[in-house]
Amino acid sequence: MTYIVTDECVKCKYTDCVEVCPVDCFYEGEFMLVINPDECIDCGVCVPDCPIDAIKPESPELIEWVERAKDFIENQGWKNITKKKCALPDADKFKDEQDKFNKYIIKNMH
């Protein structure tokens, strides 16, 4: 099992979670963070530190997020992040928007 960063993180990228992770398993892309499922120890320490509730426990309906995280780390070269940074400039504007992954990540991959 692992924890998963979901759609809520897209275009916000609050990084409060990375500082509390005991195994430094967060990776950073331009618009969001992901958790490396092979490094996560399923402790859940990061969950309460996410101000937008973007981190969820692995479940069958979220399995696509596990595959996306692996792809971003292994094939897209996302780098490990271990220190808190400022959120994206328009994070407050985007925090309640839905379907951000399809609107902003998928769109930029083509």
Curated annotation (Swiss-Prot):
Organism this protein belongs to? Rickettsia typhi (strain ATCC VR-144 / Wilmington)
Cofactor note as given: Binds 1 [4Fe-4S] cluster.
Task: Keywords in alphabetical order, please.
Answer: 3Fe-4S, 4Fe-4S, Electron transport, Iron, Iron-sulfur, Metal-binding, Repeat, Transport
List the cofactors: [4Fe-4S] cluster; [3Fe-4S] cluster
Q: Name one Pfam family in it.
A: Fer4
Query: Is Iron-sulfur included in the keywords of this UniProt record?
Result: yes
> Gene name?
fdxA
Give GO terms: molecular function aspect only.
3 iron, 4 sulfur cluster binding; 4 iron, 4 sulfur cluster binding; electron transfer activity; metal ion binding
Superkingdom: Bacteria
Q: Which residues bind [4Fe-4S] cluster?
A: 21, 40, 43, 46
Protein name listed in UniProt: Ferredoxin
Record's function text: Ferredoxins are iron-sulfur proteins that transfer electrons in a wide variety of metabolic reactions.
